[in-house]
């Protein structure tokens, strides 16, 4: 039997898969979220003052906001460490890299730069780890990246200088982004396809909870070095537990390592208490073994090319709008810890809604993704029609702040869906490469996002126009993708040989290779059960849709 049939025998979501969900979608995501937003508290700037009389004895007191601030910034550039320690005093009850290395005034850009280094590392990690895990296996690459992630993260807490901190943040980003991506794929490949949406949504939900958890830890641990080190205790526990999980049976199957795939499946069956389960994996005669994918394969086949270009844009927009709305919301005032917790908790309602909608036949993955993207885009576009001053009446409720919160809720939902949707659109042999490439473009959106709020100086609603236009465009483009709800999971490129789909009323398009040498037989007559569903066919016989 094939691997999908084997999962029906061993259990698609048994006791052991529930444990894997708890490990890789709950505990791991709590840790991943902590590292991803570490700079929010570690890089926060405490309140401070300087000895104005000593620094600027001739400065007029009446020109404080303009002249004195500029003079103080100029002085920081030339003053040595001992002078800064003598004249600058932090009054807050917590420490950070800003207070330790005086990253204030003209030096404050270094805090943002450290955050950029982290996401630059994630940019590198998501694409490189995807290819490595497709070639060497999910578990090996996941564990290696996880161990290095913890090592570099602990090194953050012992940083002797800003430069060392920035370098280790880049390395943490590379390992954190890469290993979490591989863990997501590993988890999905250990459960039945019907439960992919649930597993993915749980991960997104607990990433949001992880933000609130980090705020709580920061409230009690006010030393940035202690905080940066202690948050890795949770990661260490997850790493030790991960040593005993199996390799992905789907990856082993796609590589032709049938005996090892059977061992992994029998382990799952044993932990699911299905001791009498027996099966033997076989490959169809037409399927080549040890098939591997590369980055170029995403653009070699016409179907994969179309999917990849649309998905890259959607991932880019999700990241751009998510981080852009967060930055343009402004300072809420009050406790930094309460604000950070709220920024995570506000995302939580979107996840149960996602789990419900994407599993409904009348909505599915495609329509739900499109609806959330379009709703978020429209919410942002409405801002351009609102008055800039809105203190009374209906505008006290319907304003840029409330609409941006709605936008963040919807984009959080879309981000969760696109993760699940993307993993279902690519075959196993290239799934990590596809996810890594799309995730890479989301990091580009995250890098650009901080610059969008500054457009308010041109026109106050211009940032929302950018977010709304890109969100609405990506929502419409998502309708060009096929539905994957209850569809058989693609394993290898041969599963794409006679793969067809309908696109906006056009006739079905069979797979074609851009390279003439890669062209496959296109003479099979294809059909579709409905205009709303897509079918996957094996090269020799039709594989029925899973209802």
UniProtKB/Swiss-Prot annotation:
GO terms for cellular component: plasma membrane. Glycans are attached at residues 58, 63, 80, 106. Residues 522-547 are annotated as: Disordered. Residues 529-547 have a biased composition (Acidic residues). It is a multi-pass membrane protein. One of its GO terms (biological process) is amino acid transport. Its main location: membrane. The keyword Membrane applies. Organic zwitterion/cation transporter with apparent specificity for amino acids and their derivatives. Has low affinity for its substrates and may regulate their flux across the plasma membrane at high substrate concentrations. Bidirectionally transports carnitine and acetylcarnitine, possibly regulating their cytosolic abundance and further fatty acid catabolism via beta oxidation. Displays high transport activity toward zwitterionic substrates such as glycine betaine and diet-derived ergothioneine and carnosine. PANTHER family: SOLUTE CARRIER FAMILY 22 MEMBER (PTHR24064). Belongs to the major facilitator (TC 2.A.1) superfamily. Organic cation transporter (TC 2.A.1.19) family. This is Solute carrier family 22 member 15. It comes from Homo sapiens (Human).
